[in-house]
Amino acid sequence: DIDTPVFSKRSGVTVDNAYETSFKLIDDLKADYGMSTEVAAGFVGNLWHETGGFKYMQEIRPLVKGSKGGLGFAQWTGKRRDNFESYLKKEGKEDTASYDANYGFLKKELDTTESRVLKKLEGISNIKDATKVVSETYLIPSKKYAKIDERIEAAEDILKRYNEDRSLTDEDN
């Protein structure tokens, strides 16, 4: 359950599963794409915003009447949702909320159809610019619902907690 507090696997500090997901995403984006911690946190802050802190993997009130709405970490809609569902079927994954399913599809997109966001992130070193680039290039929400300040706030909060978690872990070593 994502609302149940847990001990951080790294530092022993109590965090909820949503932050554990955030920290894992940062680590994976850094490892797979060479992103700085700040840029990765900007990416994750957007996904946090899209899902209400990784609580809602299915869009609650779809904006497009009659549509299935967004699904997954990036609230993929339309053709991208169809591609996510096809990916799940092909990979034999049934849980649309699982980390492996969502990160696997995110990675597939970044390696292929959505690689332009990685190019735009090159040379960016601050969290605000990274958050804006991911929102405007990868997620592309309607202007009415973009709420970039909330995305940046989420990214900054995640970065702060990530750095605190990692510094506590480093002190233990």
Protein language model features and the residues they cover:
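Generic secondary-structure boundary/helix-capping signal
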Residues: 1-5, 166-173
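Short coil/loop linkers at secondary-structure junctions
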Residues: 35-36, 94, 165
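Short, functionally critical alpha-helical segments immediately adjacent to catalytic or ligand/cofactor-binding
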Residues: 37-54, 132-135
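Extracellular structured ligand-interaction cores
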Residues: 40-44, 70-73, 103, 131
